[in-house]
Structures are given as C-alpha cells and as structure tokens.
Amino acid sequence: MGVHSDDWIRQMVKKHRMIEPFEESQVRKKVDGSQVISFGLSSYGYDLRVSREFKIFTNVFNSVVDPKAFDPRSFVEMESDCCIIPPNSFALARSVEYFRIPRDVITICLGKSTYARCGIIVNVTPFEPEWEGYATLEISNTTPLPAKVYAEEGLAQVIFIQASEPCSISYAERNGKYMYQKGVTVPRL
C-alpha cells in the first residue's frame, strides 16, 4: 500500500518482465556522448521513452474530434527522430517500452519536468491491474510556438502504486479495449 521503489521495479522486471526494454538506471547520454532527456529507472518510478511513431492532429479536412466516431483524417502520421507539434496543438505517440502491470498495482504517469517547463504537457491514463501493452501517450503543446519532442528519449515517469488488496476483476478479465495495444492507438468504444 504505497508507491514502489526502484528495488521493487527491478525485481518485477526480472521476475515478470514488467517493462521491456528496461534500463537499469537513468540514462542521460547516448553512446556518442550527446545528451538526451533522461529515461530509465528512477528512485520511485520509471521514466519511459517516446517511440518514433507520432500522430499529429491537423485541421486540413476540418474534422471534428469525436471520441465516439474518430475520423482518421484528423491527424497526420509520421515516423521520425523528433516531432514538431504545432502551436496549441496535440499529438499522440507510443512508448518504446512494453508494460505488464501486476494484478495488485495501478500506475500514474506524469510528464517530465523538462517538457513541462517548455509548455509541453503529457497525459497518460493509468495502467490498470493486469493491463499489458505499449502506452499511448497524449502530448499537448500549450504554447503559441511550435514545440519539439525527441523520439527515443524520456517523456514521462510511471509511478507504480500498490493496492491495499487485489481487485476482484482486472483489466484483462474485463477484456479492456486497449489490452495488448501495439502502436499509437486512437479512441475506441
């Protein structure tokens, strides 16, 4: 009943493959020595990376963003080492890491301060008990300027919270609609 530490996260990765790929410590530099926005294991969480897959919202077709009838023309898909999000706009992406959440744990995921201090807000819904998949990441540029997000670098921190008791019905048992998601996943009903 509380937030799990780096030791617990490390054990769950070794025993249950909770995070793949897994970085044992905070990575702040590439092999060539250039700096990156940090990712990997931290004291009480795991800093996930954003992949090279992005869906950037666009108004080219004047579509309405409707969660019950999502129009795929609402965004432009791209694969790149970085993503430029237009002013006051939004992009979807996915994590590099694949997660397997234990039955008695729920997560909260918060954007890294490096991006938050630039007006880039990351929203990720909780990873529910026994959810498994790549995380879809919602990235908002709240500034009046274009904003750059770097692929394969840190974007948000996942905090693992122990429940007081296991849930009676897990996300997997409910056949959750985002179970085993692979790519950037748009709204489903």
Curated annotation (Swiss-Prot):
It catalyses: dCTP + H2O + H(+) = dUTP + NH4(+). DCTP binds at residues 112-117, 136-138, 157, 171, 181. It is an enzyme of class 3 (hydrolase). One of its GO terms (molecular function) is dCTP deaminase activity. The active site is at 138 (proton donor/acceptor). Belongs to the dCTP deaminase family. This is dCTP deaminase. The lineage of its organism: Bacteria, Pseudomonadati, Verrucomicrobiota, Methylacidiphilae, Methylacidiphilales.
